[in-house]
C-alpha cells in the first residue's frame, strides 16, 4: 500500500508560529473564537512552502462520488445476532492456531443500482484440536442463512447457533457436536451466505462513479488492507492465514469482472447476468484478495518473460495510461532480474479507481490505484506527477515479491512490506529513468523528513506491538515506510550492494508463499555478508529514535539520542538497548570512503583511524547514507560555511543538503547555535541544484513561519531569502524548459521566491493567472500549481474563484484537479474559504478521498489556518460518522494544528482531545501534535533573540 497522505510526514513541514504568547482566557471567549474563526481569519498564519515541488497530494476525477457522507445502512443482524458471550477463545484479538483455512470458494454478486451485494463462501478448514466452535472475521456484512458445516467425509454437521462477537469483529459458529482434528484427512467445509452494502465508505467492497460522455457510470472494487477483507466477506483475516482462492463474480452483462487471477471461464446465467470464474490462486493473505466490476478500457504491454501487464482505465482517459504501461514493463522486468525470482502469477493488472481511500494497493495480480498515482498526461501533468506515478508503480511492483510472495507474520513487522517497497521503489525508478538521481532523492523524500518525526518522544519503534485494528492501521506511517527504507539504505551501503541483493534473493527463496519475521531477513543477510547484521540492525528496529554523533578533533566520536526537545528524558520510554545504537559509520578521507562499526558497548566513544592532521576535514556520513545526524565542533561548522561560500561544489549536492538539514535540526534541539546554521545559507546565491534547494526550503520554513507576524523582523528575513533565491529564480525563469530535475528545481525556487514576496515572481504568477482566466491560454504544466496558488492569493476574487471551481468540475485529469483544489484554497477571502469548507460535505463535488486534502490546503492559507482547525473541531462527529475512527487519514488530520505555538492554542487542542477521547487510529498523531506545540512554545522562548540578532546584524 502507498500512503496517499505522505505530505503530512514527508517533504516540507508546515509551521506557523506566533511571536506573542497569549495567556489562557476564559472558556466563553474561547468558544466564541472557535465559532467566529470559521467566518473571519482572526489569526494570521503562514502560507506554507508545501507544494513548491508539486509533491505528493491527492486527486480526483470529474465523476461525482455517490457515497453518502453520513448515512449508514439500516441495522440487520441476520441469522447471527450480536452476543457478548465471552466463554470461548473468540474473546481474544488473535485467531487461534488450531483453526487454519486452506482454500476459499468465493462467489460475489454486486447489485449496482441497489448499492448492495450478496455472496457465498465455502471455506476449507483444517482443525488440529478438538472444538465445537469455529470463529472467523466479519464486520458490517451480515450472514443471511444459518451456516452449513461438513466433515471431511462430506457428512453435514448440525450447527447449533451462530452469533457475532463484535468486540473482536468475529462471527462464531457453534456445532452440535465436537469437531475432531482432521489430520491426514480432507478439510472441513464451512459454508456461509452473506450480504453487504456497496455504499458508505471506501473500504471493503464498494461502488463509486465517474462520468463518460456526460453519462454517470459505476465501478465496484475492493480495498482490504489491513483489516477490511472481513467487511467484504467472512474470512480468517490475519496475514499468516494464507490460503488459495477460487473467485467467481456474478455481474450484469454490461460489465466485466477482474480479480487476482486470469479468467478461467465466462458463462451466461440468464438474460441479465453473467458469471466470471477465475483460476485458482496461489496461497495468499486475505488483505491481498481483490475483485472489481467495471466498464473500462485497457492498455497492455508484455514483459520479457511473456507476462501480460495491463492497465485498466476509463475509456476517455486511455491515453493517460501509456506512461504507466511503459514504466510498468521496464520496472517489472528489472525486479524479476534483481530478485532472481519470476513473478508468481500468469498476469498482472492495474486499475485506476475514481475514488480511492489510499494511494494504491498491491493486491496480487490486480493492483488498485488512485488516479493521480497511475495516470499521466504529458500535455497536462507536471514532472512531479510523472515521478510520483513512476514511484508508486515501482512501490506496488516491489510488493509482488516483498509482501505478496513473502508476507510478514504479523502486522508488528509491517516494515518488511512497506519499508522494503519504499526502498526498492527508488531502485526500480532509477533503472527506468536514469537521469532522475532517484537514489539521491531518497534523502529528500524519506530519510530527512522521517528523521524529524523520529526525533519526537511520540515516535515508535519500527517493530511495534499492535493489538487492535486501530493500532494496526496506525502503523501505516512514516516510521514503517520511510524509516524502514532509510535503514535498508544504510544496511545496503554497509554490507555492499552485491551482498544485499544476494541476501534478498535468499530470503525470498527460503520463505516463498510463506510468512516471515524481521529475524528471518537478518539471517538471510548474515548468511550472504558474514557480518553481524542482526546485532547491528536490532538496535535500529526495536527501539525508536536515532543518534547524533558528536565529533571532537575530527576523530573522536560519541553518540547520544537525538531529540528535538532538549528538556525530554532521553531514557524514556524504556528501551532494552538504552537508546544506544550499533552504527556503521561511513566517512571519507582523501576521497577514500571507509566504514567503521561503532559498537554500542563502547560507552566512551570511538576514535576513527585517520591519518589526517591539523585542519583537515573528515566528512562523516557522506550523502547522509546513515540514519543519524552529525554535530561537529563550532570551528568545523564555521569552516564548512566558509568553504560553501568559496566553492560549494567541493561537496556533493547530497552533502550540501545534509549539512543544512543537520545544522538546522541541531539548532532546533539547542545542540548548535542558530548562528552557525544560518551561516550555511549565505552561499545560496550560488546554489544551482535541486537537492540542496529542496532541503533549504524545508529547513528554513520553520523560522520563516515563526517570525511571520513580527513586523520588525519578518521583512528582514523575507528580504534575505528573497535575495538568496533571486539569482536562481531569475536564471531559470518562467519558461517551462529543461530536463526533469531542472523542472523540479524551477518549481521549488519560484515557489520560495513567491513566498518571500519577490515582485517579479509574483507579477509573473498573477499575469499568467489573469491570462488563464480568459480561457485562451494553456499554462505550462510545471508552473500551474504556482500560478493557481499565487495568482489566486494575489488577485483572486469571487469571480476568479468561481471560474477555478468550474475548471475543477470540467477537467477529467485527476492531477489537474488536485492543483485546482490547492488554488481554490489559496484565496485571501474568508467568505470564499468558508464556502469551500461547506462544500466538503457535498460528495458530488469534493470526493470522499479528497476531503482531508482540501482541509490541509486551506490550513496552509494564512486566512484559513484557524478556520480549518475550527471546522475540524465543530464537525468532528460528522467526520467520524463518515470515515470511522479506524481511518488513518482522519486520525492524521489533527496534525494541521502542529504550527500552533501559544498556551491558549495548546489548551484548545487538549480540550478538543478531552472532549473526544476516542482517537482510534489517530492516537499517535494526537501525541505528536501535543508534543510539537509544546516544543514550539519553548522554542520561541529559547531562540527568538539569537535569530533576531543574526538577521538584524546583516543590516547592521
Swiss-Prot record:
Residues 48-87 are annotated as: Disordered. Residues 1-21 are cytoplasmic. One of its GO terms (biological process) is peptide catabolic process. Residues 43-956 are extracellular. Its main location: membrane. Zn(2+) binds at residues 395, 399, 418. InterPro entries: Aminopeptidase_N-like_N, Aminopeptidase_N-like_N_sf, ERAP1-like_C_dom, M1_APN-typ, Peptidase_M1, Peptidase_M1_aminopeptidases, Peptidase_M1_dom, Peptidase_M4/M1_CTD_sf. Residues 49-62 have a biased composition (Low complexity). Its EC number is 3.4.11.7. CDD domains: M1_APN-Q_like (cd09601). It is found in: Cell membrane. One of its GO terms (molecular function) is glutamyl aminopeptidase activity. Pfam families: ERAP1_C, Peptidase_M1, Peptidase_M1_N. PROSITE patterns: ZINC_PROTEASE (PS00142). Glycans are attached at residues 126, 199, 326, 556, 569, 599, 643, 647, 679, 764, 797, 802, 829. It catalyses: Release of N-terminal glutamate (and to a lesser extent aspartate) from a peptide. The record marks 481 as: Transition state stabilizer. It is a single-pass type II membrane protein. Substrate binds at residues 225, 359-363, 888. Regulates central hypertension through its calcium-modulated preference to cleave N-terminal acidic residues from peptides such as angiotensin II. Homodimer; disulfide-linked. Belongs to the peptidase M1 family. This is Glutamyl aminopeptidase.
